[in-house]
Swiss-Prot record:
Glycans are attached at N77. Interacts with GRN; interaction protects progranulin from proteolysis. The keyword Secreted applies. The record marks L97, M98 as: Reactive bond for chymotrypsin, trypsin and elastase. SUPFAM superfamilies: Elafin-like. This is Antileukoproteinase. It comes from the Eukaryota. The gene is SLPI. It comes from Ovis aries (Sheep). Acid-stable proteinase inhibitor with strong affinities for trypsin, chymotrypsin, elastase, and cathepsin G. Modulates the inflammatory and immune responses after bacterial infection, and after infection by the intracellular parasite L.major. Down-regulates responses to bacterial lipopolysaccharide (LPS). Plays a role in regulating the activation of NF-kappa-B and inflammatory responses. Has antimicrobial activity against mycobacteria, but not against salmonella. Contributes to normal resistance against infection by M.tuberculosis. Required for normal resistance to infection by L.major. GO terms for molecular function: serine-type endopeptidase inhibitor activity.
């Protein structure tokens, strides 16, 4: 039985992808908590994002959406039961092309006003609820 000359390269590529997936899964399990509620302030310019992933943040800090962009913030504990806001999340169609999209919220209480924390195309975001 003959193997193609591409077979070793295929094995190398699959091995690299497997390691990358396992490493990402381990990292994902390490950062606990959720981003704190966003401050309701106005942004007066476009700030450069300070992070795009929790793993760019030191220690237990998480990469969170803040007033004018993203920054590393101390997480809040989400083990306490949280009141859900009324209404349901809108149905989102499509598929995210990002490997690890950033969640801008984890629970409804992290969203201002009547907004709810809903699954969007890429990660969770605060959205206006749909009236039932």
């Amino acid at each position: 039985m003959k193997f193609s000359g591409l077979f070793p390269f295929l094995l190398l590529a699959l091995g690299t992808l497997a390691l990358w997936a396992v490493e990402g899964a381990e990292n994902e399990a390490l950062k606990a908590g959720a981003c704190p509620p966003r401050k309701s302030a106005q942004c007066f310019g476009n700030e450069k994002p300070r992070c795009s992933s929790d793993w760019q943040c030191p220690h237990k800090k998480k990469c969170c959406l803040d007033t004018c962009g993203t920054e590393c913030l101390d997480p809040v504990n989400i083990t306490n039961p949280v009141k859900k806001k009324p209404g349901t999340c809108p149905v989102i169609h499509g598929q995210c092309l990002m490997l690890k999209p950033l969640n801008h919220c984890e629970t409804d209480d992290q969203c201002i006003g009547a907004l709810k924390c809903c699954k969007a195309m890429c990660g969770k975001v605060c959205l206006s609820p749909v009236k039932a």
